[in-house]
Amino acid sequence: MTKRIILALGAFLLATAALLAQNPTGGVKGTVVDRGSRKAVENARLTLLEGATELVTVDTDADGNFMIPDLADGMYTLVIDAPDFLETQVQVTVNDGYVKNMFNLSLTPMQKVTEVDAESFTEFDMEDSGYNDNPTILFGSNDVFNNIAGYNFSSVRFRARGYASETQDVYLAGVKLNDAITGYGPFSLWSGLNEAMRSKETVNGAEVSDYGFGGYNGVTNIFGNAANVRKGLRGSVMTNSALYRLRLMASYATGVMDNGWAFAANVSARLGGNDWIDGVYYRSFAYYLAADKVFNREHKLSFAFFGTPGQRGAQNASTQEVYDLMGDNMYNSNWGYQNGKVRNARVRKTHEPIAFLKYDYTPSDDFNASATVLYRFGSNGYTALDWYDAQDPRPDYYRNLPSYFYDANTDMNRNNPLKWGWSNEIWTHADEYPELTHIDWDRIYNMNRQQNGRAKYIQEERHVDQQDFNFAGSFLWRPMDNAVVRGGLTARINRTEYYKEVADLLGGEYFLDTDNFAERDFAATPYKVQNDLDYWLETGQARTLKVGDKYGYDYYAQVRNFGSWLSGKFSFGSLSATVAGRLGYDSFWREGLMRKGLFPGQPEDGAMAAAWTAKGVVATEESSYGKSDVSSFVTYAAKLNLNYVIGGHQRVYANVGYFTDAPKFNQAFLSPRTRNTLMDDLETVKTFAADLNWQYASPGINVRATAFFATINDQSKVMSAYDDLQNAFSNFALRGIDQRNMGFELGFKVPTYVVPDLSVQGVLALGNYVYTSNPTMTQTVDNSAEVVMDNVLVPYWKSTVLMDGTKKQHYVAGTPQLAASLGLAYNHNYWFIDADVEYFANSYLDMNPLYRTDYAVMGQDNNITDVEIEYMTEQEKFDPAFLVNLSVGKSWYIHYKYQLGFSFNVKNLLNNKDVKTGGYEQTRIVDNTVSKERFYRFDPKYFYMSGTNYMLNVYFRF
């Protein structure tokens, strides 16, 4: 008996030991919800991966719930896929045999806003205007305000919180990719690759992101790697009445396969013109190839290569006189007929491929790091007409308009009613005189053929060709359960070549490389008229140009950026705090590749000096050739974020930050086309920004309210235009521009509770964006070293100030300061119908500094009156506008393998064609008056929104 008991006890102990020796098994469960509405997502497919091996696949039930049991301890990847949502991946760790509750796993809907990118805006011809018309591209489909405003406000080129578009940080694969020269967003570099670039993460305002420190206007990181492209084969066809007739797109992605590889490809073509603007067209293509390799749980490598070769015709701004005469606010002066076919003089031609390689290292749940190297290269050209000793070929040149011949104001010295009648007849009967109201290409060719080979007119191509090398490394470390530390290092080496080349001789045989303005002023000094002085010194004659030859100017913009950042997030129950800092070093310089006769600089040695003297060349301090002084800046910034969660649905959070940023290359040189001269006393831009936010999110309800405030000081700006008073192409360099931006944002989407699946949605952006300083201005001209105005005050920049002290505030232009949208959204059974009404107000015309100097206000008699002050310095305010937009779409999910869908969007349903979306004051002055007492402005130029536009997109996914 005792033996039996001992044997039984031994067997029990052995069985227990065997059980204890086995790995504990646990699991993972949770609920899949719509990130925006918080509604449960039924039939979402969840695939669990261990490394690259697929373990199990389950679907969510009607309440969005799922359960995956019997998992050994370890690290897993959970891939969540559902119709009309972006694919999402999350990391899961199972410990000690427990079933891990993931609670709510949110999916981002594929909204119509994803069709909005930089190419959703017409290419405007405004290179020489000093006007910046770049809108803010709003992403963040998890944010109700951005999700609605990003689509509904795109027509009026809305800028979030009134901030300049270059303050919005855009990352690709963890690399900040804002343009090194201008700071502008780089969206055009991947336009047409919607599927490849669809997966992204966004933070708003001054929040700190996972990928970089960011600024005060949000951060968007586009993943761009193969594993984040939605699995399967997808094709789509789209037609768009505002941009192009046809877009064809196809994409294919394998997802992460059993062998750890993932491959993806995306191609597209955008072709044709549009319904509104003659001469504007697209002939653009795009390609994307990417591969990921998951070696194991710890190591992953990603590579991608893509580009968007193509060309598109540009639209030009015109004066209201021209629009009224033509009876069309969509008139475009950039085109004309050549042999009966439309030809645009202004065409953007680009192909700037990008390649990146990214390494991800994830040794544990508590630490991961990544490093990315990225290289951008290629060509970016922009054609325009150039001419020598010939009539200006632009049809809307002011000397071709009726107002040049007659004006009711007799002081304007325009009193020729006969010529006014002839001009008015031409412009009001444009169909009968197309050769006069548009570019007369046939006349240009005939003129060139009569010049014994030397072309009077050519088509030039202005190039901005970048070689841009970037490195970004970042890490995430969780030293304890309630703390997360992030940081990183960045480096950028950019060399951009600015030059122009002969694109078309237009029937001529050659063109001479001389400076037209210098030839007029220095005809007796031949070396001064040479664009390439070294060639003239060697051969004794100006260069003879053929197609493809560089001429006029040629220089490098050299930019170097290095930085580091660190952030720490600490959680204490419902309260969390994030502190972050950034330290950087930025430098840039100009490197001239062509010695210009007007600015030869100092000889490098005595022999050169003797050669120059023999030719009559006089050395100058200002040089067009060689390396300029180096401008360098140490920059720093700090941020604080506080976040308090109230219950399960509300949170209150605040952000505050102080930032110093180096000026950009394009705003630092007085005349980079001609010489190395930097603006005096350049300073970093200093910004203080703060916002306070309240957010409520529950199933069906999503609300965010934000109050924001910012001061942006010590900005600089350089603009170029022809100055009639100097009879030369002139440059106006401003420094010390301060502004204040404050306002309120509200976004909401709430159920009606009357009709199932019908919601009321709306946004409100109310701002006050004003100038708070009067900057100083330096004016130079391209054909002389003389400084026309040296660091003079612009006393009427921030406001119009009358003699009695009465002030009228001036506002930051480029965006409506009041924008509102209210509408209904219906979502049921994969149908969506949105109808919205928009209201925009408080938009202002972009100002030029010359009109706001004492010199311009005093006029020729050096006397200031209230009449002159108001006339010359007041800022134009645009009329408010109402718009109606409608969107409808449907998708069908077939056997959970195939998806067929369409979306149809109509913008500006009321066909309102009188909405000004922007414009600028010409930097020109009428001085040939009868009284010789005052100056008069030239008419400003405007951009208008087109009438009713539609976009139809049909797609099929395998």
Language model segments and positions:
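Gram-negative outer-membrane beta-barrel transporters
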Residues: 574, 707-713, 730-851, 955-957
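Signature of Gram-negative outer-membrane beta-barrel scaffolds
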Residues: 458, 484-647, 672
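Surface-exposed extracellular loop regions of Gram-negative outer-membrane beta-barrel proteins
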Residues: 311-313, 317-322, 529-544, 587, ...
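Short acidic/polar hinge/loop motifs at secondary-structure boundaries
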Residues: 137, 144-146, 175-206, 222-225, ...
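Outer-membrane beta-barrel signature, preferentially recognizing the C-terminal barrel domain
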Residues: 330-354, 358, 620-633, 637, ...
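Transmembrane beta-barrel wall of Gram-negative outer-membrane proteins
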Residues: 27, 239-272, 276-315, 347, ...
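C-terminal beta-signal and adjacent terminal beta-strands/loops
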Residues: 712, 760, 839-857, 890-958
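Acidic/polar loop-and-plug regions of large Gram-negative outer-membrane beta-barrel proteins
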Residues: 298-358, 381-461, 524-549
